[in-house]
Amino acid sequence: YPTRTERKILKDNKTEIANEIGKSAVLIEPGAGDIKKIAIFLSSLDKPKKYIPLDISEDYITKLSQGFKKKFPKLAITPKGYDFSKNNKLPFKIKSSENIIIFFPGSTLGNFEKKDAVKFLKMLKSKFKAKKIIIGVDLVKDIPTLISAYDDKKGITAKFNKNILQRINTELGGDINLNSYKHLAIYNKPKKRIEMRLKSKKNNNIKINGSKYLVKKNEEIHTENSHK
């Protein structure tokens, strides 16, 4: 539901969003991904000046932006490779006098611990000299709905969660059998967050970077949080 619901919110409120953003905006989207969400309200804006989508993969975001430029030919689009989580120097110049708007949808903020989320938001405001920030966050709701979103019947989230094991195999010389682990999505009520874990189905002897480890049967690897 998160992506579907967020798209609907943006569509239903695009006029109000445009009014809040104002005229001649410079839109910056950290972790832009497929850049589809900003397209929902972009045509409603009053003469936007520039759109800067940022992604950790510059090749990916550059290729994706080519089609975006055809859809919005009058808009200056400058894709850049940038890992916003590392707080590195920006790969472009910005002016504090400009109407800079940060667009950060997708409830990615929920992946941070609370103190880190506050720190991250302060960084966005200061580093990007943002006038306003549009953030997507997921709300607390009934537990079955939350669980089903992170343990979907199609197994999309499970595949995403297990991808970290595949990356260990590819990048760190691992020999992990992905089928030996079960994807879990658990709601931690006191901390108001979904916890994604990988549960070992049996005793697994694994190798990472030449070192050997034992992951015991039913032992859980805590991979990610999504705070609500």
Where are the language model's segments positioned?
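Conserved class I S-adenosyl-L-methionine
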Residues: S24-G33
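Conserved SAM/SAH-binding beta-strand->alpha-helix loop
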Residues: S57-E58
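S-adenosyl-L-methionine
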Residues: F68-K93
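A short, conserved alpha-helix within the catalytic core of class I
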Residues: N111-M123, K129
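Conserved beta-strand signature within the Rossmann-like core of class I S-adenosyl-L-methionine
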Residues: S126-D142
